[in-house]
Amino acid sequence: CEDMNIEICPLDKVLVDGEAICLGMEQSTVEAAIGKGILVGKRYYYFNDDMAIDYNDNKVDFIEFLSGIDGMLKPSIYGISAFESQADDLLEVLKEKNNGKINDTENGYSYQFQNISVGVYLEAVPEAVKEMIEEASGFGNPMTDDEIQYEMKRANHWATIGLGVAGYYQR
């Protein structure tokens, strides 16, 4: 898994080591290419749960990478590492490529780019981490450098990135 080359091509496909997993592709074709997924709820998980696919009528509807910066899979989108790049850097590229409506109603934790059907999610935001540091100090229990570093990593790198069929985020 670790050395896989994964490229996200919005509104079209994900390339996994050159193997195309296309939006709208039949589940049987996907699983012939990358193996059988593990069904949990309505999602199928692949590559040790680092990638999930939602199917609609047995066709790929949404693909999500769930592992963030510490995961095995390192997808790229528009030539940028989705998880290793700074969250703000990727956010600017996605805004530019989307060139339209963005759902950003979760106070910086997630963004849904409607024109390119891409969504990203953070586990923390820098402002919340700063508040957490101040509160911990205020309660007489300051955070350690390791704890601060961990929280800042969560605030500065996307935890998930997903792509859906055209119109996915307008539903």
Where are the model-predicted features located?
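Short helix/turn-capping signatures at newly exposed starts of structured segments
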Residues: 1-171
